[in-house]
Amino acid sequence: MKRIRKPNFDPAVVLDTCTSGINDPELATRFNAARPYLLAKFHDYERCADAHNLFSFDACSWGNETQVVVADMSKKELVDLYSDQMVASSKPGRKQYDSLMMLAPLGKCPFCGFGQVSTLDHFLSKSRYPAFSVLTFNLIPSCSDCNTGKGSSVLENGTQILHPYYEDAVVETVPWL
C-alpha cells in the first residue's frame, strides 16, 4: 500500500458543487436542508479516519434503497448524488472527480502499487455508507481490480484495511510479505 496526498477540497464546497447540478427543485431543497447533517458526518469521518477507527460508523442495510440515512435523504438519493453529479462528465462535480483520479503518483493504484488507476474507490462503500458518497476523503483513486476486489463489506474492528490518505509513513518502509 502506498500513501497518497489527502485531497485539499473543502467538503462543503464539493457537496455544494454536486448539489448545484440537481435539476429537481424539491430534491435540491431537501439536500440543502440535509447539508448541516452531512457536513457533521463529514467532520466525524475525518476524526475517525485520523484515529483509524472508521469501523465505528453504522452501516446501512444491504439493498434497501429507500432507507433514510441522513435527515430525510434516502440511501438511493445519496448514492445518486455521486453517480449523477460527480461521475457524469457534464456535471459540476466532475472536476473534483478528475482531480481525485490524478492524486495517484504515476497513475498507479495506491492499494496494490501495480494497476493503473481507472476508477475511484469508496473507502467506506457507498452502498453501506452512502452519506460519504461525495466526501473526497472517502474517494480513493484505484485500479478496477482493487476496487471490485474490496467489495462493499461492513467494516469491523480488526478488519479495517489501510487508508491511503490517513496512514503513517511506516506503511511504505516496512515489508508486508
Which residue ranges define each predicted feature?
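Short low-complexity stretches enriched in small and charged residues
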Residues: G63-V68, R94-A104
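Generic hydrophobic, aliphatic-rich segments that mediate packing or membrane embedding
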Residues: S74, L78, G93-Q96, P105-K108
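Short, glycine/acidic-rich beta->alpha junctions
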Residues: P92, M101, A131-L135
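Short cysteine-rich loop/turn motifs with clustered Cys
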Residues: D98-T119, C143
